[in-house]
Amino acid sequence: MKLGSVGLPNVGKSTLFNSLTKAGAESANYPFCTIDPNVGVVTVPDERLALLGDFYHSKKVTPAVIEFVDIAGLVKGASKGEGLGNQFLANIREVDAIVHVVRCFEDTNVIHVDGSIDPIRDIETINLELIFSDLEILERRIAKVTKTARMDKEAAKELDFLQKIKKWLEDGKMAITMELENEDEEAWMGTYNLLTQKPVIYAANVAEDDLANDGADNAHVQAVRKYAAEQNSEIFVICAQIEEEISELDEDERKMFLEDLGLKESGLEKLVKASYHLLGLMSFLTSGEDETRAWTIKIGTKAPQAAGKIHSDFERGFIKAEVVNYQDLLDCGSYAGAREKGLVRMEGKDYVVQDGDVILFRFNV
């Protein structure tokens, strides 16, 4: 999974990136301190891994990961080259979802490029730049398809669809909110790689005082919640400054720190939960003496395709999957014990993998 973070300058975007990835992206109190997209890897917290690793005495434990791309702070006119220009918008065309960091805290010591705190205005500023960037993509595609539309019925149908999307965006609406009417439209939309078609997770960056009650008393957060609900987007509340402090602590210290703040989970855990929910993802597990590992797949993935996440040969030569639920395995105390109780199942190519399945794939190539 690959996420791209966007936001106006000085909303706490790079601070959040630093804390989540520990990649050390430059962060400063002035616009455009991030000149190139920073890329980091975020490990997906999963308490099942350590327990399963101990169960098998695994030499290595490998969590699932999220690739996180931090894009330079955007401003009005970014799609036309203002600020750091639209080349930075191109850097997020390949991500699975966009994490839009919005400022929901008041602090006179941290400047705002527009002089006041208004997260909805900020969101719409960024969205407009994404729309402008997508319109350029559509204009180029329209020019290409127009050349063959007179002689080609399929091209003519696509041209009509392109004009429909163009009108939608020109009305200030995001492509993801447009209802697609048939399989052709779904297929065409999938090839354009539009920024406004990508799912969005809003990270409401608040002051420490707003963390414990999840921003319930923060009018800015409530405005973003309402906006996100209308867009079928996810939102989580975070304090980038606190996350930066947490990132320097070990696991035990981190838990104590969160408890002192009245928090049950870190910002990273909130981000992962929101990402998995928005994108319809889950994890299955493989485990043995050499390695215990989590693998991220789409909900509804069948066994051969899940096997292919490990290696293409596993999918190509798939025979069957030996499956046991993670909790059942631990409760039985051994794999043999789980097998004796009939909890280890042999599943074929039509089996839909479930979250927390521990799987041993049988294959032959």
Where are these regions (language model features)?
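Conserved G1/Walker A P-loop phosphate-binding module
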Residues: M1-I111, E139-R140
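C-terminal-of-GTPase-core extension/linker across diverse P-loop GTPases
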Residues: K2-V6, F17, T146-V352, I359, ...
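Short capping/connector residues at structural and topological boundaries
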Residues: V6, F32, P37-G40, E47-L49, ...
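Short, intrinsically disordered, mixed-charge
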Residues: K22, D54, A90, E94, ...
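Glycine-rich, flexible loop/turn motifs
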Residues: A23-P31, N38-G40, R48-L51, K80, ...
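Conserved Switch II/interswitch segment of TRAFAC-class P-loop GTPases
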Residues: G40-P45, A72-E82, R93-A155, W168-N182, ...
